[in-house]
């Protein structure tokens, strides 16, 4: 099995055991899409709280998610990404809930979402943005979840990895599209994926390049075509995440 197949098999088990929550009031914060459109002068940063990953193993198991998130916010991050997958990334919905309670900026639930139950749970925990990964979903399931998330007043970051998936995301009408430089089947990373797909971008969409960024020079490779980058591991390994995050905010 590939990494993605293994993760999705486990996710089916998790979701089957997950209760369907009643929808609660949504946390108040700004629209991430509107924020990106209003601040085009700099590459914006989505800074991630991630304890571990399937390919790298333990990254920072002792991290306090709230302290980490507050450091990111102080550095000027536009949004916090919180991994909520418990098995492969050692995250939890409680991490998301605690971060959302303690920062003012948007928080995205980073998980392999396959059910409306996960969307409701994420919203109730304080997420205002959710991730939908095209390679993890059929086109029909993607459309259904996108519509359900929109009905819940959640912004949706639709993740793609190749030209075919990019076309699907644009056809769907996604306003936030993330290009993952990581192949979810092999977990290999190549920033050139973002450089290549930028040739086929449509207008009025905000594009985020995800994974593989360690330096300002890395960010500079995609700064002309993208509105933001998502960075996790590089920040999680730093002793001073606030200083590290500030280094990654480059001009476009």
Curated annotation (Swiss-Prot):
UniProt keyword annotations, A-Z: Amino-acid biosynthesis, Aromatic amino acid biosynthesis, Decarboxylase, Lyase, Tryptophan biosynthesis
Pathway given in the UniProt record: Amino-acid biosynthesis; L-tryptophan biosynthesis; L-tryptophan from chorismate: step 4/5
Single GO BP term: L-tryptophan biosynthetic process
Gene Ontology molecular function: any one: phosphoribosylanthranilate isomerase activity
Enzyme class: lyase
HAMAP family documented for this protein: IGPS_B (MF_00134_B)
UniProt name for this protein: Indole-3-glycerol phosphate synthase
Protein's organism: Listeria welshimeri serovar 6b (strain ATCC 35897 / DSM 20650 / CCUG 15529 / CIP 8149 / NCTC 11857 / SLCC 5334 / V8)
UniProt gene name: trpC
């Amino acid at each position: 099995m590939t990494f993605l197949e293994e993760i999705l098999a486990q996710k089916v088990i998790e979701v089957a055991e997950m209760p369907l929550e009643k929808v609660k009031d949504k946390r108040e914060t700004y629209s991430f899409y509107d924020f990106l459109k209003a601040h085009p002068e700099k590459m914006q940063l989505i800074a991630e709280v991630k304890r571990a990953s399937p390919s790298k193993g333990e990254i920072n198991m002792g991290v306090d998610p709230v302290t980490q998130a507050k450091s990111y916010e102080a550095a000027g991050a536009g949004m916090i990404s919180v991994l909520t997958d418990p098995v492969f990334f050692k995250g939890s919905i409680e991490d998301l809930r605690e971060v959302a309670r303690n920062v003012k900026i948007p928080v995205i639930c980073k998980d392999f979402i396959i059910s409306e139950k996960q969307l409701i749970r994420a919203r109730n925990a304080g997420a205002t943005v959710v991730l939908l990964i095209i390679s993890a979903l059929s086109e029909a399931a993607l459309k259904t979840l996108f519509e359900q998330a929109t009905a819940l007043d959640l912004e949706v970051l639709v993740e793609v990895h190749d030209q075919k998936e990019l076309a699907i995301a644009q056809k769907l009408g996604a306003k936030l599209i993330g290009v993952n430089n990581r192949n979810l089947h092999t977990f290999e990373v190549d920033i050139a994926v973002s450089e290549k797909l930028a040739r086929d971008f449509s207008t009025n969409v905000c594009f985020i390049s995800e994974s593989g960024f360690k330096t300002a020079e890395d960010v500079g490779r995609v700064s002309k075509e993208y509105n933001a980058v998502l960075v996790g591991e590089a920040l999680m390994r730093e002793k001073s995440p606030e200083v590290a995050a500030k280094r990654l905010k480059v001009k476009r």
